[in-house]
Amino acid sequence: MMDKEVVYIAELDADVDDVVAAHYLHNKGVLKCVVLDPYPKTKEGLERKERLESLGVTVLKKMPPIAKYVFVGGALTLVADYIRMHHIDWLVMNGGFVGTNIATYELDKFKGKETVRTFNFNCDVNATDTVLKADERHIGHIMLVGKNVCHDIRNTQSGIWNGDEYKELFSKYHVKEEKRLHDMLACHEGIAYINGEDTFCEYDVVKPYNEGLCGTMTKWGSTKTRTTPYREVLAAVGYKKS
């Protein structure tokens, strides 16, 4: 269904999460290319870039001419620019937050919170602002897998990632047992949802909102009732009961 059509936007400096997610997409046979946004500055980030290239992955500094499915583990700077003249069918992103006003299950660290800071959104808040306001002519669907599910203990090797097919990938990158696999979760969910397969999470239609743009300190949440300048998105609200 999505044979080598996923453009993955990666931030390779922060930790191993993005490179594992990119490798996962490559293993699944759905990866078209990796676009670096922001471009890595650290030794580790540049090594991760070389590692992807050694797998035969195309690694770019800018968006390719056609990007039907865009999965995001980095910033939205290049996407915001791209959609001025191009269309994306599905934008799937590790980002955002569904809080106490909507989520039935809350993690202790977010109990009672409706908004939190979220890394990928805040890499470039103006770009995020643009993307979340884009209409269907520019982006057909937006799917957000946010902090409320990413930080869950289930998002680890002892939880949903305990299958044999993941072991080799995790050992290759020395992924710790308790490491939350934020970007890999978003990638898995995007592939599964678009292909009509089983997702790990439950989804609901919400609108993102913030408490005012404030650079990297911007706090984001989701709403079904309040007025917001942003469009409706599909957001992960919790894990399915197993």
Q: What would you call each of these model-derived segments?
A:
Residues 2-242:
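N-terminal acidic, glycine/proline-rich low-complexity segments
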